[in-house]
């Protein structure tokens, strides 16, 4: 038996909006410690990892480990029927091929339940090792989102370079080039407005902007984003989910065919 009750139901809606563009079908894994998902995008270029810890739910019951295969677009359609202030309960019986979503309005004068068929999805769990990164950038998620959007109007790729001076986002396209530099800025009134750079050594990597733009759909979940970079590793773009967990996106760097862009 599985029963999860989430008071801030809007959080689950935001999670779905953050990942459904990348991933169509995925297994949600429930265990005693939390509700998680790990899935590759259809082209096997990006990986998304989600964790919602059990203690973040008002009520969390998971009698045994359970994997529920869901179509994320269908799940998003159901969650759109919930009000932003609704309490969301997810229920599934052992061995059942359906999952039930229950939406309660805060004053409990309206309760709706939606049942959705589960799917059999073959998925392999990739062990993601904890790594040391050459550079870690923390910055306002809205700023990162704006940069990716602005650069997309010029080019298809972004070069992210971290030096002592700051973090530079660059692109080049048919109409010209663009460079945006964010300097370290810790002396802000609000911690969420800070840009903090921890650098062991300078690093410069190239990524596809369409993926970066897709990752920024998680911005409503967190006011800060953490970007971890190392020359031999995929970038990790992480959005912390307050008190509960995180969404992490992993993307392999592009091997730059066009050397002119580097010069």
From Swiss-Prot:
Expressed in proliferating tissues. Expressed in roots and root apex. Expressed at low levels in young leaves. Not detected in mature leaves. Highly expressed in shoot apical meristem (SAM). Expressed in flag leaves and panicles. Keywords: DNA replication, DNA-binding, Nucleus. The keyword DNA-binding applies. GO terms for cellular component: nucleus; PCNA complex. InterPro entries: DNA_clamp_sf, Pr_cel_nuc_antig, Pr_cel_nuc_antig_C, Pr_cel_nuc_antig_CS, Pr_cel_nuc_antig_N. Pfam families: PCNA_C, PCNA_N. Residues 61-80 bind DNA. Transmembrane segments: none annotated. Induction: Induced by the cell cycle inhibitors aphidicolin and hydroxyurea. Induced by gamma irradiation. Induced by heavy ion irradiation. Induced by UV and hydrogen peroxide. Down-regulated during sucrose starvation. Its main location: nucleus. GO terms for molecular function: chromatin binding; damaged DNA binding; DNA polymerase processivity factor activity. It is found in: Nucleus. GO terms for biological process: cellular response to UV; leading strand elongation; mismatch repair; positive regulation of DNA repair; positive regulation of DNA replication; protein homotrimerization; translesion synthesis. The keyword DNA-binding applies. HAMAP family: DNApol_clamp_arch. PANTHER family: PROLIFERATING CELL NUCLEAR ANTIGEN. Homotrimer. Interacts with FEN1A. Interacts with POLL. Interacts with RAD/GEN1. Interacts with DJA7 and DJA8. This protein is an auxiliary protein of DNA polymerase delta and is involved in the control of eukaryotic DNA replication by increasing the polymerase's processibility during elongation of the leading strand. Belongs to the PCNA family. NCBIfam families: pcna. This is Proliferating cell nuclear antigen. It comes from Oryza sativa subsp. japonica.
């Amino acid at each position: 038996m599985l029963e999860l009750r989430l008071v801030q139901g809007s959080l689950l809606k935001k999670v779905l909006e953050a990942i459904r563009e990348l991933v169509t079908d995925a297994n949600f894994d429930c265990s005693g410690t939390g509700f998680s998902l790990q899935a590759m995008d259809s082209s096997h270029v990006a990986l998304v990892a989600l964790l919602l810890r059990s203690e973040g739910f008002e009520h969390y019951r998971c009698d045994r480990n359970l994997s529920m295969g869901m179509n994320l677009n269908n799940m998003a359609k159901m969650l759109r029927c919930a009000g932003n202030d609704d309490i969301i309960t997810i229920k599934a019986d052992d061995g059942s091929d359906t999952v039930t979503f229950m939406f309660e309005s805060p004053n409990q004068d309206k309760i709706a339940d939606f049942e959705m068929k589960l799917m059999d999805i073959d998925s392999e769990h990739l062990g993601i090792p904890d790594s040391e990164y050459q550079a870690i950038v923390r910055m306002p998620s809205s700023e990162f989102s704006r940069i990716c959007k602005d650069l997309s109007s010029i080019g298809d790729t972004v070069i992210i370079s971290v030096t002592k001076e700051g973090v530079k986002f660059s692109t080049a396209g048919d109409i010209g080039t663009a460079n945006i530099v964010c300097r370290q800025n810790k002396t802000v009134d609000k911690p969420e407005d800070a840009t903090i750079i921890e650098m062991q050594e300078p690093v410069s990597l190239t990524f596809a902007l369409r993926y970066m733009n897709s990752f920024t759909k998680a911005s409503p979940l967190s006011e800060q984003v953490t970007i971890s970079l190392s020359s031999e590793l995929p970038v990790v773009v992480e959005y912390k989910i307050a008190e509960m967990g995180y969404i992490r996106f992993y993307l392999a760097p592009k091997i730059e065919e066009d050397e002119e862009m580097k010069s």
